[in-house]
């Protein structure tokens, strides 16, 4: 059996769009067949039926009314499906044979604009990622606003993932040959639809790129930016089936011109959505976005995502906010005008996409009506930013006048229903309307006349699209109908419908006028739309100014409402905040209940603030607060404090909270270590780093060792030494102040009562002496017997704990000194063994000395160590010889006054293990553990 002719045409179209759900227009319905029908039926919960397709079995089918498609398509697209719309391209009544059909648009997550969405303040980005030699190239576009940008950077995976996290595209295009490992990581960062294309073939020519933009813009592209731009434009043209005129500016940007914030940090700081609810509420954007327009809302989000790092640019924006902040009346008038402005960017996008309607153009006219008022308000401003807005704002008077003269104030819902064009704009429209009006009057007169003639008061003249005009008489009055007066047209259950020759003639006149009027109004509307389309560049420029102005106005309003202050900006590495507050927490609990805190960070004595204190005391909130205040200052916003002087940070990193990646096979601790590793590899001396409870995911001593080692790495690495907030529950680490450069102790103030503690939420100088873990557990409601038993166990453990950080620190310094001697005096592995062995010559007295005394002692003992190295070298050689001969000798090794006798040296593995230990390559805690194990093994040989 063969497929029916219609189904053959369907299969041809489906083969071309096999990665899409095909909406196939049949009459008044979009129909889906086979697998598409099964998918749509499942996802949209529609009834699944069947259709005879010429095969033995009926084809699975489901459908939706064409006028209801707008309600169903968004549900499919948000689930990650692509939808191809196949329309009838000719009138079925005039078609000979199979109706000609074709795909008129492909709707994908990256190209879909839902006018009914409540996310109008969000951008819908489509992104292309390409690799060329040692560079990543990115191009992105929001076709609804006409934005089209490109950038490139070194082939550093983290930079790519950070950019994806920042932009948050709805769809990503990659080359078919992309590295699968990279693809997996992209999916882990942002699980969106990824479309693969062959970038060698799927791209427009350079000439097409120039035609879309300009020769000047395209000639400035490097090859790594040109490739993704060509691919992106190709995909837009392929899905939209047309060239979009609102995409007329190709912007290049550099990622180094904005603060870098990786995906983890964006999530931890809750910049645009809360961690728990994944919604805007509870985020920084929720606090700041009081925008008057949708365009302003999108601008504020961009400013949060891309804080500035150039001092002049930050201060320019701050000065603009300050001027509006200082003039409350000005801002009230400005916001009153801004609230009357619709989303000009997206209306322009609809004009370009040929799907704008009359109400959209009325919204545009209403928006343009407010531009003269806004320009007048800006006339006397003094800041560089606002003066620039005044000088560059185009009032678009000609476009406004065109719309004012042509579009009716109450237009019809559909463009093919008429009632669009104003009276007086077109003479022919006026004449046809007059004819239509007279026709309707004639119909009303006919109805009255026939009622009087027949005496049937219920007689009426009606109309429908199938039968046209008719005279309807109920069956109860059937006997009153004059014989031969009417021609029967239709019989109903309770009535009869008739026509007359006179009515038929008038019907042709009326319907002819209506059809001509509808077609004429539509053609005039298209002319108006095309005239406005010619001014898209001007419209976009004014829309950009309005959106930026709304952003400035909103920042001023938020500052006024929340008692924010203008921060000072410096490049000296100093962050000084007086009475800083967390903008989101303060908004939730109320300003009066929030405890403010001071912060002082620099690149000398307060490089790393070591913050100790119990859980739930507010350490994490304080750390996030410092990061958010820094970010707000660099985006040009006032900040929640009484005073703030902020050093420009090139990057913000955070390691806060516990998480795991079970799907990726990573434990909580593994994820934590991966995040810390990423920070240590990518932070610079100008970065701000927040580390919370490093080492929490493993055993106490392992965690303590890692936390200590990370602090050492940050403070001792001359190429790093970044501003760091390091919160920990290892209160033993407070002794690092004075030992490591730049470490300063702070803690959360706690008021300890008889059986409980009160968290004062105040950050004070000095370290905490205990963790108050049991008190926190009690507050959480653990049973009393569990709490009491925990106290007993704690007392027992504390009695046995002999850990001394000063002792380990001394060992570390001696080890470092020996390492220097070893480098100078020995060049082979045997010398390295001797140098390692020397690490045991530390006595208990030296570990109790002050730091200065320890340093002096180390310096004076260098000569003794050199002699000891020679002596130990000789002894080790003897041991190796004795071992080969299986002779038993005696030798003593001293460690903290402990004597160990090696009487039996037959086991080669002990000597081998001792010779292979690289104790200088271990951190102090690892060195102690290794030494302890070797001593234990040695005892077994006695």
From Swiss-Prot:
Q: Which SUPFAM superfamilies match?
A: DNA repair protein MutS, domain I (SSF55271), DNA repair protein MutS, domain II (SSF53150), DNA repair protein MutS, domain III (SSF48334), P-loop containing nucleoside triphosphate hydrolases (SSF52540)
Ligand binding (ATP): 613-620
Q: Does the record carry rRNA processing as a key word?
A: no
GO MF annotations in UniProt:
ATP binding; ATP-dependent DNA damage sensor activity; damaged DNA binding; mismatched DNA binding
Q: Which GO terms describe its biological process?
A: mismatch repair
Q: Give the keywords, sorted.
A: ATP-binding, DNA damage, DNA repair, DNA-binding, Nucleotide-binding
* GO cellular component annotations of the record: cytosol
Query: What Pfam families does this protein's entry cite?
Result: MutS_I, MutS_II, MutS_III, MutS_IV, MutS_V
Matching PROSITE patterns: DNA_MISMATCH_REPAIR_2
Task: Identify the PANTHER family for this entry.
Answer: DNA MISMATCH REPAIR PROTEIN MSH1, MITOCHONDRIAL, DNA MISMATCH REPAIR PROTEIN MUTS FAMILY MEMBER
Tell me which family the UniProt entry assigns to this protein: Belongs to the DNA mismatch repair MutS family.
What's its job?
A: This protein is involved in the repair of mismatches in DNA. It is possible that it carries out the mismatch recognition step. This protein has a weak ATPase activity.
The name this protein goes by in its record: DNA mismatch repair protein MutS
Recall the taxonomic lineage recorded for the source organism: Bacteria, Bacillati, Bacillota, Clostridia, Eubacteriales
